Amino acid sequence: MHYEKFPDGTVKCIEDKIPFELPEGWEWTRLQAICEPITDGTHKTPTYSDEGFIFLSSKNVTSGHIDWDNIMYIPESLHNELYARLAPQKNDILLAKNGTTGVAAIVDRDCIFDIYVSLALLRIIGYIISPEYLLSTIASSTIQNYFNSSLKGIGVPNLHLEHIRTTLIPVAPINEQYRIATKLEQLLSFADKIESDKIFLLTTIDQTKAKILDLAIRGKLVPQDPNDEPASILLERIRAEKEELIRQGRIKRDKKESVIFKGEDNSYYLKIGNLVESLNDWQIDDIPETWGICCLGEICDYGNCINTDTKDISENAWILDLEDIEKDTGRVIQRLTKKERNSASSKHLFHKGQVLYSKLRPYLNKVVITDDDGYCTSEILPLEFSNIIFPDYARYYIMSPTFLRYANHCSYGVKMPRLGTADGKKAVFTVPPINEQKRIADKINQLFSLLDSIVKNMD
């Protein structure tokens, strides 16, 4: 059984407070029994200055480390007052009382500084406890769970000094403490390396996916088939059909029609009205001979959306919002109805098989092909492509680094950048023969599936 003796001589059984049994030679003790009087920093909001003495708060304490870069300063007069009350020193432990509650770090440098009320200061008595051992103990799930259960307050929960002082700490023999601290350091270093390698691999996979898309839209991902009907013939057919519709008066000619042509220098140019601009930035001079080049607005109804008032939408209709689409993948991560979403704004109607493109914050790269009819936020454009464009190829093209770079460059607005309709319509689009588009999409799906399986097996 475990008992605790109090200063007045009384003894109390604390068996129900003991978290677990310890090995022989270990003992449970209160944190206040192994530290000098535990206190916290100043309770007064300080007056900061551009220079002076370092002033730390819980914002400067992360798990196991003190952030000495993003610090505040206080004037000498205030420092003298605070330092006379509490003078932190090297090897003290700073424990966050609020904010990132329960997070602690060892003071790892010999310098003069002061602390705010959000930090408690633990200074070990003598050499009975290794600072590294105590830090690892505080970081354990047992102590953290105790801290979390002791939080007080509603807005910003606080860990009161009394609960810190009475925290039960398992104390190992001093030599074993050092062995534990050394082993933990080795394991944590190994874990950090694994995490670093994982981040590197994830970054490499993202870069590989981007490179695959880049090769795909330049005709370098799958071999060409000379028997495929050239895309240029298909594009000419579309243009001829459009001219016929204009002649019949069924549609009007765009006053600022975008036309891509090849100059005498064998480079591509974009003509809009009387303006001509080079397309060298698109790097399309070496696409296969069977491919064609056009503006996005020539092969889809970019910007021609059907707006629907919310009162005309069924309660059970699918309402797609930007937050429902995972960035960079084109996956729909949640599906809500109008009743579940409770949205009052008008929506864009979309149909199964259309490519949906988020014009808002294009850097998030949210592009999806729908598997059902529904309605979406007005920041998403449903794109209906002509029958010479395979939807999966169109989606991958719009997700490619080349298109993404263009969309980000043309976006307007600082906080909420979006791609304008005119810029979207004149975006360059490389068109392979329809059969090659399918082969490209199949190859991308195959390669992406392989890369995704690698990521999945990392978890």
Question: Would you name each region that the model predicts?
Answer:
Residues 1-15, 205, 209-289:
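Intrinsic disorder at enzyme termini
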Residues 1-24, 69, 80, 88, ...:
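Flexible, glycine/threonine-enriched loop-and-boundary segments that flank and lead into catalytic domains
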Residues 12-40, 189, 197, 201, ...:
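Non-catalytic DNA-recognition/assembly elements of restriction-modification systems
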Residues 13-16, 27-66, 81-83, 101, ...:
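Low-complexity, Lys/Gly-biased intrinsically disordered segments
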Residues 20-29, 120-131, 161-181, 188, ...:
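Proline-centric
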Residues 57-58, 76-139, 156, 164, ...:
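A short beta-sheet element
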Residues 145-146, 166-252, 406, 426-459:
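Amphipathic alpha-helical coiled-coil/heptad-repeat segments
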